[in-house]
Structure formats: C-alpha cells, structure tokens
Amino acid sequence: MAKNVVVIGAQWGDEGKGKIVDWLAEEAGGVVRFQGGHNAGHTLVVGGKKTILRLIPSGILHEGLDCFIGSGVVVSPEALLGEIDELNAAGVKNVEGRLKIAPTCPLILPYHIALDQAREASRGKGKIGTTGRGIGPAYEDKVARRAIRAADLLHPEKLREKLDAVLAYYNVQLQYLHNAGPVKAEDVMAVIEKVAPRIAPMIADVSRVLNEKNKNGEKLLFEGAQGALLDIDYGTYPFVTSSNCLAGAASAGAGVGPQMLDYVLGIVKAYTTRVGSGPFPTELFDEVGAGLAERGHEFGSVTGRARRCGWFDAAALKRSIQINGISGMCITKLDVMDGVETINICVGYELPGGGKTDILPCGSDAVETCKPIYETMPGWRESTVGVKSYDALPANAKAYLKRIEEVCGAPVAIVSTGPDREETIVLHHPFA
C-alpha cells in the first residue's frame, strides 16, 4: 500500500502541480515543499475561487493540515510573510500555526535579488530567463557555505557578523562586474529585524516531525516545484533552474530517507509549454500554438510572462520518466486540446548526420539540434471540460491518452479536465 507520494512536474514546469497537490492533500497528514523558491506559482481553484501559492505548500487550504518547508527550499522571508498575509485576508485559518520551516533553509535577502537582476541585465541576448527573485544566488551561497539560514534569525548578534562578510563579497561583484550600486548592511538588517519576530516561531525540526508522522502512519505528500526538464543536473543546461527538481530530491530536501517515498506522480500537460529561453523541439509558431496559449491561459502565475506552446513531446517525457522513476502520470489540461482537428505527438528526434533517438538528449546544445519525429492522430470536437468519468471522454481523447501511455511507458493515473479541484478523473489513486 502506497503511503507517501511525491508530486513532480515532468516537463518544463507549469504542468498544474498545485491543483493536484491540493486535491491529494485531502488524504494527507502533511504536505512538504522540498526544493525551489518563490520563483514559480502553484495555482489552486476551489469552488471557483483562485489562489496562487509560491512558497507555502498547496495543502494549506485544507483546514487543520500541517504544511512544511524543507531545507531544500530557499526562502524569501518577505515573500513568505506576504503570502501568509494574503491567505489570512482570504480567511484561511491558522496559517502560521500550521506552517513549519526547517532551520537549515537558506534565506533570500536583498543582495541576492540585486545580484540576480544585475547579472541578467548584463547577459543581454544571452539571458537565461531567470525571474530575478534571487533564487540562483541564494543556492550559490548554500553551496559556498556562506548562506544566512532560517536558524540565524534566532541569533541576531551572530547574524550581523555573517552579513558583513557576505556583503563584502556581493558588493565587489555588484560594483565592479555589473556597474550597480552596493547593498547596505543597515538596509538588510532592517528587513531581518522586521521579519524575524514572525518567522522565528515557525522554525522547527521538519525532518524529525516528518519522520514521526511517518512512524505514526500518517500519509505524507511531497510537493515539487518547476519541472524535471529544468533540473540543474538533468535539464536543458544552462537554461535550467538552480535546484534539483527530481523526485529523488524529495529525500534530501525534506530530510527523510528514500525508503519513505512510495509513489512518484508525474504531472504532465496534454501539450508542452516552456517559459523563457532554452531549446524546445516541438514549439509551435502557428495558429494552433496561439490557440493552445489562449485556451490554456498560458501566462506565468508569478511573472505574467507568456509561455511558449508546442505539441506533446513523448521523447522528452521518456527522459523525465527515466530520471524520476515515475509510477503514474497525471495528464492535465486535456480540455485545452478540445477542437484541435489533428494532433501531433513527438515520438523521437532526427539527429544531425542522419541518426535518430527516441529520448531527449542531455544538454541544451544537443537538444537544440533535434528535429521532432511526429505521429499524427485525429483530434476531437466534443468538450471534455469538467468531465469526471473516463468512460465519458470522447473516443479520440481516450485514444490520445492510451497512445501517450504506450509511447512513454508509464500509466495514466489521473486526468484533469479543468482547474477546479473537482474536475478530476481518477484511474488509480496514488495513495491507494
């Protein structure tokens, strides 16, 4: 019997993880964010009301449910408190009482944001597409062992000494490499002194609490951010995020042993999207792509940036299934494909020199040279919006899902036919 479930994005992010985590949270005893920062939004729609979460786990809307931010997450205290205030204003109960933050979480502070934005501006046409929220520099500090972490908020007398050393490093870069102004220690301390009284009570030994919950038989839900193809190691590098987005990162990022991860649910959009720069073999530049973007409301929930749209890429998904050990797939936004007369599925790529491959190559340069090989299927005219039974889906929609299973080599467990929590078809429940 599966007890703990990891939910990850199996493409380039924006697959609809938030809705599915919110839906699964009904049966969970705790929901955990284990990587990323506030650079991506998870959108939930409950009873027609939309909520966008960036740092707080998507289970927070369930009254009484404990939520956790593991040490793999880089936390902006200001963004976190802003999100809490939004939830409080919306009537969500006891947010601060139910949210626990690992003491080992690196903090995102003003100098991270300043350097992130200065670097991106300096890249010119070579921009990576960072959100400019300081995520990358914060992860750099973690690896370089100079991060200011959540636990440091409990010891302000030592924090100032650490801050002075960090700013000496940052201001050299800002002033001499990027021709930007320095960040003042007094300004950073003002932020810290403002947020510390509210953040400190939420700091807890997340790893210990999660392991205790597991021993007590409570189901745990691990919520990933971004997508596997943006992973710092296995994504289309350098056009990737700064963290490990794979299912395996749930263990280290939450502080639990890998034996506690029973089921990996890969969230997969019924077509493919990507935000920002980077190779995208199946990208569409015609009216079909424009139609997907319009019907799918393909704009970033945090940045507002338009997402690039393309055909379903089964070869890319194969890579994701391989590196995540995906147990089952949740296909989202099936309803956006309604009315597309002819559908293409990318089943592989032609390579320079005449070769072929049925799986996404590693690295951006290799992917850039790939030419998609398509299979064509008939679409469907009937509406799938809000359909809650697999048998009620159009025959061609079911054939599309079946072909995705066959080409990718993983079963479809869930189908989402709309943004609301209830617009969901369950073929196999991950917690079953």
UniProtKB/Swiss-Prot annotation:
GO cellular component entries: cytoplasm
GO molecular function term, any single one: GTP binding
Catalytic reaction equation(s): IMP + L-aspartate + GTP = N(6)-(1,2-dicarboxyethyl)-AMP + GDP + phosphate + 2 H(+)
Record's keyword terms, sorted: Cytoplasm, GTP-binding, Ligase, Magnesium, Metal-binding, Nucleotide-binding, Purine biosynthesis
Positions contributing to IMP binding: 14-17, 39-42, 131, 145, 226, 241, 305
Biological process, per Gene Ontology: 'de novo' AMP biosynthetic process; IMP metabolic process
PROSITE patterns assigned: ADENYLOSUCCIN_SYN_1, ADENYLOSUCCIN_SYN_2
Active site annotation, chain numbering: 14 (proton acceptor), 42 (proton donor)
Cofactor, how bound (note): Binds 1 Mg(2+) ion per subunit.
Pathway entry: Purine metabolism; AMP biosynthesis via de novo pathway; AMP from IMP: step 1/2
Annotated residues for binding of substrate: 301-307
Places the protein is found: Cytoplasm
Main subcellular localisation: cytoplasm
Source organism superkingdom: Bacteria
Binding locations of Mg(2+): 14, 41
Homology family: Belongs to the adenylosuccinate synthetase family.
Protein name, as recorded: Adenylosuccinate synthetase
Species per Swiss-Prot/TrEMBL record: Neisseria gonorrhoeae (strain ATCC 700825 / FA 1090)
